[in-house]
Amino acid sequence: LDAGITFARSHDAHLDVLCLGIDRVQTGYYYVGAAPIAPIMVQETLDQAGKDAHAVEAAVRARLAAEDIRWAVDTAIAQLGAFGGEVGRLARFADLVLVPQPYGKNAAPEQEAILEAALFDGRAPALVLPADQPNATYGKRVVIAWNQSDEAMAAIRAALPLLKTASLVDVAVIAPPSHGPERSDPG
């Protein structure tokens, strides 16, 4: 949240925050005898996800109320594996999605799916914040993943304002073809 506030302030941007309550219980694995209580269990776990989302929403609203930026908060509840549509629906209206690094010792299991939903369902560019320095000055060193796709070109176009201010831009060429008129050349 702090990184989003800093980014919004430095770019005179509007910050939208999604507070997502995730039901992590996978209902497909109940045993046969659980059929009478399964609907109650599903409702209980969804209710808990809703309480979690609303608690986060209250904390986010309290934090943002003291800030001098434009902001909005959205809250959603979804089951594990089914929240991609909700994330994508909101991400498609964003110019940029800020997400924590999806891998590492403190990463939540759903962070990878949230990033993928923003990128592929929402078709939004994403800025992955480093896990060890989430509030550091970001955008000085940028890594671009290039695979010659339309998506890669759209991401680079969307990132041009950040790329122009970067001190160093690295291009990671992903699975380049061995031959062809448009062969990627990292040199």
What are these regions (language model features)?
Residues 83, 111, 152-155:
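Amphipathic coiled-coil/heptad-repeat helices and related helical stalk/stem segments
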Residues 22-24, 47, 59-97:
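Structural beta-alpha unit
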Residues 6, 85-135:
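Gly/Ser-rich helix-loop-strand patches that form or flank binding pockets
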Residues 1-42, 121-122, 134, 138-187:
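Small/aliphatic-rich secondary-structure junction motif
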Residues 78-81, 105-106, 177-183:
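Short, small-residue-enriched loops and turns at beta-alpha junctions
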Residues 38-55:
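A short acidic, glycine-rich active-site loop
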Residues 73-78, 104-107, 148:
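Short, flexible loop segments at the rims of nucleotide/cofactor-binding pockets, characterized by
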Residues 15, 71-75, 126:
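Generic structural signal for residues in well-ordered beta-strands
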